Amino acid sequence: MNEKYAALRANVGMLGQLLGKSIKDHQGQAFLDKIETIRQLAKSSRKGNETDRERLLDTLRNLSDDELLPVARAFSQFLNLANVAEQFHTISRRCEEQVCTPDPLEQMFDKLKASNLSQEAIIQAVRELDIDLVLTAHPTEVTRRTLIHKHVQLNDCLEALELSDLLPRERDKILNRIEQLVNQAWHTNEIREQRPTPVDEAKWGFAVVENSLWPAIPEFMRNLDERLQHHLGVRLPLDAAPVKFTSWMGGDRDGNPFVTAKVTAEVLELGRWMAVSLFYKDIKELTSELSMSDCTDAVRERVGDHPEPYRALVRELREQLRETQEFLTAKVQGQASESRDLVKTTAQLREPLELCYHSLHACGMGNIADGMLLDVLRKLACFGIHLVKLDIRQDGERHGQVFSELTRYLGMGDYAEWSEDDKQAFLLNELNSRRPLIPTDWEPSDETRETLDTCKVIAQHDPDAFGIYIISMAGAPSDVLAVQLLLKEAGCKFRMPVAPLFETQEDLMAGTAVMERLLSVDWYRGYIQGRQYVMIGYSDSAKDAGMMAAGWAQYAAMESLVALAEANNLRLTLFHGRGGTVGRGGAPAHQAILSQPPGSLRGGLRVTEQGEMIRFKFGLPKVAIQSLNLYTSAVLEGNLLPPPKPKECWRAVMEQLASVSCDHYRSIVRGHPDFVPYFRAATPEMELGKLPLGSRPSKRKPNGGVESLRAIPWIFAWTQNRLMLPAWLGAHKGLQQAIADGQKGVLEEMSRQWPFFRTRLEMLEMVFLKADVWLAEYYDTRLVPKELWGLGKQLRQELADSIQVVLELRPQGDLLDDQPWIKESIKLRNPYTDPLNVLQVELLGRSRNHAETLHPELDQALMVTIAGIAAGMRNTG
């Protein structure tokens, strides 16, 4: 690494040395020497030294069974520590210009002021900001919570070490604590003993809120408020909430039988309990701050002649919160507790606090009002008393199943066999009817009972506790109307927004027609009251058609949905179901947002934050603030300075690119007779099922092939063997065809002028740097039957061709030359990830050949390599 990253290198070196000390103390000097030899050989191998590469392979192949687990753990833990150092570096005082983005909000306001926009337009856009970040528990977060907690403490220690005026004994104390934490991590099992339950996942999400987002939000809001004041002379309203958080943890039951109505109800109570507990802590602290005596008449009317009027007001809240906390604690623990003076709405907390705020300003104490009191008001606006809203997601087939059972019971035939027109007529008739549809004596199947119970849970809770109801694999208007009828039958008194999820290429292309039909229904127009949500699926469309074709289908779908919304005077919020990887729509937030069609952000931004990406983007308060600043600046830019509409010649090229790339992708993934056996042999796909990653099964149908495999394990498996196939397969064929047709100049123009296309190429470059042809070949030679080697050789050649064609279109000399920080970050981790790949091949070979006699420690070692490679690749699923 060059001198720009000296501070990062120093921290990585220090943490590595301390890990080495822990290893030596536990395993002895000879073992540590072996680890160091492997590390040096891996670095030399990376530089192209063939002799050292062979020595590396020999050393790892000849490890005894007893050595495999500790060697795997050593490299896996080093990668985790490198990630800690890297994440800290982005928020450290020494973070160089090449690494840290200058304050994106400051840059954005400068950019907006330099444009011809009026102040009013900018102020209006800031006030209309509506960013909803949806935390999901997709099973790619392989790091245990206990280790994450130690990593957060390591970050705090690295931050403390940066202080220039530390006394020697203070510095020694911090270094000793770092050594303790590294040692604790080494002696902690990095693999969970059991899969987390959906409630465990929800608790993990709540912990992210408590430890990181709770302190980050007021700081982020203060920063935005100050920028607005400095540049435009106005302030954010007290109830402003430009960013809010929703969760799928405990609400997403699509393909997860463990997320039941009971689980959803429990998670709702836990969220409320956590929110009340956090506000109770804050209000207690606020009570000690608000000791002032001057107040307005409005406050006096509430508290009488109390000498400390603000404390008197806030103490009432504190007592209410304490009683609510006790009540909810008893409820969560399954104990009976009488209902008392409980906090049931956010307004109950907001009203007295706002009264204090305005009084302090009126009495010349605005500086005090704008301290902790304002911070609590900002948290109330963002989190409310439910902490995060809960989305509900279910497969559309499950709703149809309810009506099939019911219509058969009622002697009306089978709903599933009806035409779309007949389904709509039936559903609308029942939606308009005042009598109940479901007979009290009907005994549905367990699955149907579960669907009905979920709707009852929604009906029984506060509307503010919920986000939206998402229907997976929605393909017709009846899919949406069916959910609305189920909610009505459950006694739901509020209009829960229902969003179809269009996720295959075919569904994306048909999505606008589905919405057009829905909007032609008067009842439906009345129900939505001018507000519509539509979810765009990135994972399944890419798995279905390949990254390039899926990207264009998503863009075209968004564009036509935006036009439909404008024609119908609707506020449309597009909900982006992105993952961390390129194969699942992942891209740096700023680039991803600015590559959307013009007008697609007018209804706000709603996007999933998945698995390990939650930790990388929001795991530390300062990192979370950075991420929130980036999102905010990107949405403002996307709305006020939108990207250009694509030229007709760009569209024509993209249509051809999408068609050619999709055909090639499907010819391999669906059409090649050797593909499925090759995939199963060349990747740890079968073994991934053993890793206790998340609560959701990895397959929709237990015995299905690739098509039944969820998008996440599909991507995860290809990331492990470093072929990274879903992120690039097919794209190169489309690009090669366009160049052969004389369109190279148009492609270069698209790369320069069109953010959508440029982002596609940049994401490919990042994937190519993480991919590795010799490692992918090593998996083949050791694990794949010889008769399947031909396909592996073909795919590796296609990877090489893909790199070549992308470099032809990019002005810089090498991959990611214009993004040096990302390039250095990948280069830092590669020498530590490579030995884990070689070890994984060795372990897979031993596991598959001697499954019956395999030592349990080898199974554990295999799991460690999977987790370690995930840490090395960062965005794994």
Swiss-Prot record:
One Gene Ontology molecular-function label: phosphoenolpyruvate carboxylase activity
UniProt key word Mitochondrion: no
Chemical reaction(s) catalysed: oxaloacetate + phosphate = phosphoenolpyruvate + hydrogencarbonate
InterPro entries registered for this protein in UniProt: PEP_COase, PEP_COase_bac/pln-type, PEP_COase_Lys_AS, PEPCASE_His_AS, Pyrv/PenolPyrv_kinase-like_dom
Essential cofactor(s): Mg(2+)
Keyword DNA repair: no
Active site positions: 138, 543
One Pfam family named in its UniProt record: PEPcase
GO CC, any one term: cytosol
Domain of life according to the entry: Bacteria
Record GO biological process: carbon fixation; oxaloacetate metabolic process; tricarboxylic acid cycle
Disulfide bonds, paired cysteine numbers: none
PROSITE patterns registered for this protein in UniProt: PEPCASE_1, PEPCASE_2
Family statement: Belongs to the PEPCase type 1 family.
PANTHER family reported for this sequence: PHOSPHOENOLPYRUVATE CARBOXYLASE (PTHR30523:SF6)
Function: Forms oxaloacetate, a four-carbon dicarboxylic acid source for the tricarboxylic acid cycle.
Protein name per Swiss-Prot or TrEMBL: Phosphoenolpyruvate carboxylase
Organism: Aeromonas hydrophila subsp. hydrophila (strain ATCC 7966 / DSM 30187 / BCRC 13018 / CCUG 14551 / JCM 1027 / KCTC 2358 / NCIMB 9240 / NCTC 8049)
